[in-house]
């Protein structure tokens, strides 16, 4: 009977997931159809406008340009089109990946190089599978038709993760930026034994299929366990060789009558919602996204390009006049230039740093202190407009030697910079952690929330204390993450998924000797935010929280009742150091006590309001990932009546009734190791049924209290 119930639950879960995906497919297909209708209208206007000019382009040229634009169209906003664009082995040592590749981590048997791991790469074209750096073309599967050209960018991004390695001596400079130095560079990737599926980020018909899909539909239908996305929307100032020639093009709104300008950097919009929908319906899909390379772009700080252009109300590019008030450069105040599409809640957004230098000016240094990490000048900065922390993490993105190719296919090499390269570094590390996780935990996979939690909890401090808008939660450290997985396997840390039910609190008691920081981090896959803004003035810097299920993490000193709160940013002054308080915008919460007093601490997770699902209906629970480190033991509960005989739950009866003559204040359930696994705070009731259906068979201790009474009882569940 129990087996039948388990099968029914599993089938029910799969059915619910499929229903969610079917609904999402219908919504996304309708959006894509509407998008192409908008583009068709836009194309007709462009053709008419071109034919009406004194010096029109040829019909073949205008159609070629429109065909490319149709492939990369992302969305329209107030009638204006926005397009996708690509964002352009020292990094192995910088992030301590070599410890995993070489098998030098205590507690792990053997080395890990991506064996058995597959990554889907969504990029600017097909990956050249025959490049010598991949060793074998069998490692690359191009999902696109042969009509999509090979891409040097896609090949380089894939090589960052999976290249076998190629050494090259190049001329660089010392820290002074002047003195020349010869350095040895290598293309070796994070996972030289992994395999890759290659997709074009634009609109296309996949090989063997008949229906055109955009990148979101390709992600939704292929359901990759791990995917890399080194591209994004072009927002704000963009240096382009556009229709008006080489210059800065303002990808936003501008009103010449009053000089008012708006952009959509930091705005949660269509692509963000779609990605959150996809991951919510498929919680084991880990999506990694580059933050963008727009920091500092604009005419104010780049005077060598004299042409500055904006779209008028008809969508025509016109030049700013000498009396126009130019929009500020991207991130002119040091923040707010991550584009929409990279601020989704359930993905991992990656910023870029310079390589860590050694004392002898090499590029293969290791992290030893905060000042080792330098922000890459181009790396886009957060936060999301409601103040949520973006990027989530930072990795090396500068001075990268990578395998490249021509559009026809060739083995070449290049050196480049960009969050395009920091993102696959993080993706590769997640792949290695996934391989380690499988080896330690019977082939199981990390889900999206747990993968993100592992990144954030083990990140090295960078920039301001706590999270910030340049580095997110810090600099990625592959070794620390692998070590934490070993500690989980040895039951030395808490790293698990838990369910929070409405109107309940989950509590864990831990004891520390005060010799190390006590840190807890929770991450959850949140329902998508259903935005309703469709004008620039409403969308620009919209401070409304995009969080749907607002979970709260607190750590309380049991002896003193002092409560410790999570990090948060000020949305109106996000470059200021993070403070601690009630975080109402992030689906990540972390509480850090740098110097805890020795004693017992209560780690509590609760929620505000009512939990809902992705359709907005009331949800029974919200699953979250929690990591706790820095404790020395998990204490037993205060009362365990060892002499009492357990109350046996009858077969099929999974509820225990608690009844007092006055209102019940608290109900708690412990396992026999003393770990608190359920905490309930009933609201103004004298009787309450405690549901044990979600617990495995075993003996539990139930405690309950009111103002003047206490109850403690052992429960045996078969």
Where are these regions (language model features)?
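C-terminal edge strands of extracellular/lumenal beta-sandwich accessory domains
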Residues: 450-452, 540-547, 555-557, 582-584, ...
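Secreted peptidase-domain scaffold signal
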Residues: 473-549, 618-633
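C-terminal outer-membrane/trafficking sorting elements
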Residues: 640-718
């Amino acid at each position: 009977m129990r087996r039948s119930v388990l099968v029914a639950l599993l089938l029910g879960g799969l059915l619910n997931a499929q229903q969610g995906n079917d609904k999402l497919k219908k919504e996304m297909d309708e959006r894509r159809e509407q998008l192409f209708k908008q583009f068709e209208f836009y194309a007709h206007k462009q053709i008419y406008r071109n034919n009406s000019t004194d010096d029109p382009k040829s019909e073949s040229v205008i159609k070629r340009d429109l065909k490319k634009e149709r492939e990369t169209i992302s969305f329209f906003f107030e009638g204006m089109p926005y397009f996708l664009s690509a964002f352009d082995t020292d990094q192995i040592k910088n992030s301590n990946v070599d410890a995993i590749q070489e098998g030098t981590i205590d507690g792990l048997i053997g080395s890990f190089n991506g064996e058995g791991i597959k990554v889907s790469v969504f990029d600017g074209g097909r990956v050249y599978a025959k490049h010598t750096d991949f060793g074998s073309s069998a490692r690359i599967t191009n999902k696109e038709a042969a009509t999509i050209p090979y891409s040097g960018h896609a090949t380089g991004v894939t090589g960052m993760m999976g290249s076998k390695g190629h050494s090259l001596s190049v001329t660089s400079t010392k820290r002074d930026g002047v003195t020349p130095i010869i350095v040895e560079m290598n293309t070796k990737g994070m996972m030289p034994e992994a395999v890759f599926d290659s997709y074009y980020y634009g609109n296309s018909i996949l090989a063997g299929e008949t229906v055109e899909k955009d990148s979101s539909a390709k992600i939704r239908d292929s359901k990759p366990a791990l995917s890399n996305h080194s591209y994004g929307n072009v927002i704000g100032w963009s240096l382009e060789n556009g229709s008006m020639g080489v210059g800065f093009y303002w990808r936003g709104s501008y009103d010449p009558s009053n000089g008012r300008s708006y952009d959509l950097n930091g705005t949660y919009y269509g692509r963000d919602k779609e990605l959150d929908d996809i991951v919510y319906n498929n919680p084991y899909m880990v999506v990694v996204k580059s933050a963008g390379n727009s920091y500092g772009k604009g005419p104010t700080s780049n005077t060598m390009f004299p042409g500055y252009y904006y779209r008028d109300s008809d969508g025509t590019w016109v030049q700013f006049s000498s009396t126009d008030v130019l929009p500020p450069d991207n991130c002119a105040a040091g923040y707010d230039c991550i584009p929409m599409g990279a601020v989704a809640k359930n993905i991992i957004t990656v910023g870029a740093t310079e390589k860590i230098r050694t004392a002898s000016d090499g590029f293969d240094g290791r992290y030893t202190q905060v000042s080792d990490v330098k922000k890459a000048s181009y790396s886009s900065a957060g936060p999301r407009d409601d103040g949520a922390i973006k990027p989530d993490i930072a990795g090396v993105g500068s001075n990268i030697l990578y395998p490249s190719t021509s559009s026809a296919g060739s083995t070449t090499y290049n050196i480049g910079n960009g969050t395009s390269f920091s993102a696959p570094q993080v993706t590769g590390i997640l792949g290695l952690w996934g391989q380690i996780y499988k080896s330690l935990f019977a082939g199981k996979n990390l889900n999206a929330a747990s993968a993100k939690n592992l990144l954030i909890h083990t990140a090295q401090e960078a920039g301001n204390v706590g999270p910030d808008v340049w580095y997110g939660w810090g600099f990625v450290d592959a070794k620390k993450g692998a070590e934490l997985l070993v500690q989980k396997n040895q039951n030395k840390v808490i790293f698990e998924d838990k369910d929070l039910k409405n109107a309940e609190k989950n509590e864990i008691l831990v004891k520390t000797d005060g010799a190390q920081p006590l840190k807890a981090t929770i991450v959850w896959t949140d329902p998508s935010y259903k935005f309703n803004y469709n004008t620039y003035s409403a969308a620009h810097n919209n401070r409304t929280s995009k969080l749907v299920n607002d979970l709260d993490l607190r750590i309380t000193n049991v002896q003193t009742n002092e409560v410790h709160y999570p990090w948060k940013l000020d949305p109106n002054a996000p470059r200021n150091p993070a403070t601690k308080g009630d975080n109402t915008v992030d689906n990540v919460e972390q509480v850090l006590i740098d110097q805890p007093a020795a004693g017992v601490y209560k780690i509590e997770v609760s929620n505000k309001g009512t939990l809902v699902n992705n359709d907005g209906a009331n949800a029974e629970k919200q699953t979250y990932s929690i990591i706790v480190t820095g404790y020395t033991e998990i204490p037993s509960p205060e009362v365990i009546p060892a002499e009492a005989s357990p109350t046996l739950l009858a077969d099929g009866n999974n509820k225990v009734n608690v009844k007092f003559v006055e209102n019940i204040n608290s109900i708690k359930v412990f396992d026999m190791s003393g770990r608190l696994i359920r905490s309930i705070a009933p609201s103004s009731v004298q009787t309450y049924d405690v549901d044990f259906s979600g617990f495995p068979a075993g003996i539990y201790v139930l405690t309950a209290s009111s103002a003047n009474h206490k109850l403690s009882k052992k429960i045996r569940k078969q």
